């Protein structure tokens, strides 16, 4: 059982990331390395081909798979769930540090983000994001997986863990099973959110809606918004190229409006406080799921979450870590985050065969 003390991850002096240098993965390179696939959010399933039902369904979602085919049905996967507002591109520098292993790994892109479609009249929520994740697991024949959840993806993960607990309790077929979870800079407890008022809380207001219209249509507005958004630590000298790529990932397919439309995720967490009680989920799942938590020392969005985690999860043996820097560990310290992911993936058997694999109806992953 892990110590209740929080482990601090050391960092070398100077900028830990080559994000401003020539090794940085650009947004266009990232999206070119994945694919858009048709998805039916009503049936909650990935489609082999577009069936031609007409608008607005089906929609298309971006995904990126890192794997050496063929991937056997008895292989444990690594699933990467993105943050808000940068989506899967937020993992681009981490992915570069990871290289081909651990794998197979699946990067999910939610509707509204990155190169996925951005439907206007759509009820964005953590629940529908969980539906998409499960649909992608079925499509790829994923039976067991470790999950890395960054930022607001913690809420989709909490919904997935609760569904898993409910299936286990009812004795139902498990489908894809989460063996381990690593939550980084995410919301853990509904009563511990502390976002600065001029960030996510402002974005969900009419002022935020208007601001994102200007962000989409007026050059330079979104980059200025991101620079002022407290995403980085004061000591991190974010480059113009980094901001431009973050902006490109967010603006893609008219995506700035998603920052307003999806900004109510804290309210959603509070409405589902009992269902998404992480301490209760950890107790009820017991030793069937290993849970690891990490925060950042200079994160202004969720500083109270790690304090609450030490009090509520530490006694349950949950591993808790501190990264240096600000909220976007993915940008400031991608190498440190990649090292942590690699170590946990190794410990939890990512890429290794599962004992007694059963036949799967999922497709063979490319």
Language model segments and positions:
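Catalytic active-site module of serine/aspartate enzymes centered on a nucleophile-bearing elbow/loop
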Residues: 314-366
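Glycine-centered tight beta-turn/hairpin loop motif at sheet-sheet or coil-to-beta transitions
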Residues: 53-58
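Hydrophobic residues on the short alpha-helix immediately C-terminal to a glycine-rich phosphate/catalytic loop
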Residues: 94, 160, 340-344
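N-terminal mitochondrial targeting presequences
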Residues: 1-2
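Residue-level recognition of oxygen-bearing side chains
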Residues: 86, 93, 336
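Flexible "cap/lid" subdomain of the alpha/beta-hydrolase fold that forms the substrate-access gate
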Residues: 5-50, 61-77, 85, 89-90, ...
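A short, Lys/Arg-enriched amphipathic alpha-helix followed by its capping loop at the start of a domain
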Residues: 93-103
